[in-house]
Amino acid sequence: LDQGIHLVDMMRLFAGEFTQVHSFISNAYWKHDIEDNAYALMKTGSGVVGMLHSSATQWRHRFNFEITLTKGALILSGILSGSKSYGAETLTVVYANEDDGGDPREVMIRYNQDNSWQEEIFEFTDSILENKEIKNGSVKEAFETMKLVYQIYCADAIWKSKYNLTSQIPETLLEKTV
């Protein structure tokens, strides 16, 4: 899923674990043994629905993550990457109101610095020096995200058959990584 794996990770962070997964995977454009586009529609046990589109055929790099809530929404766009090709990183907070006539108030915050790598390294170093557990981005979280990516591939029956995928993911793989 290329950059899509980061979206899958974020979807799990905000929505929880997805128990139902439907997908369409295609490599019709580049015709390699990796997907050009992945579309997934997923649902958690508590009823949260998530939708994903990860594309290698969209000619402009895009990163867009939306969380729709009962009284508004959060929209994260762009990535502060080294290539600068994903556009400005912004968070738009939407405040819906029944009297807004379909034009809710929005506040956009633009981020000009990415301190996430530094913060991750500090947390990782601290966990080693202080013998603490990792709070964010544990091996188990990474495994669960990879497992969901695999479930997305397997949910497309044609893709699953074409690449001889099996729905069974040995839990012993996780035990070997921890």
PLM feature segments, named:
Residues 45, 126-178:
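C-terminal helix-rich "cap/oligomerization" subdomain common to oxidoreductases
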Residues 1-2, 9, 115, 140-144:
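A generic "alpha-helical surface" signal
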Residues 1-27, 40-48:
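Oxidoreductase and adenylate-handling cofactor-binding alpha/beta cores
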Residues 17, 70-77, 94, 149-159:
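Phosphate/oxyanion-binding loops and surfaces in catalytic or ligand/nucleic-acid-binding neighborhoods
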Residues 7-8, 88, 118-125, 146-149:
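A general structural signal for well-ordered alpha-helical segments in protein cores
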Residues 28-35, 45-121, 135-138:
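NAD(P)-dinucleotide binding in Rossmann-like oxidoreductases
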Residues 8, 34-38, 139, 146:
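Conserved glycosyltransferase catalytic-site signature
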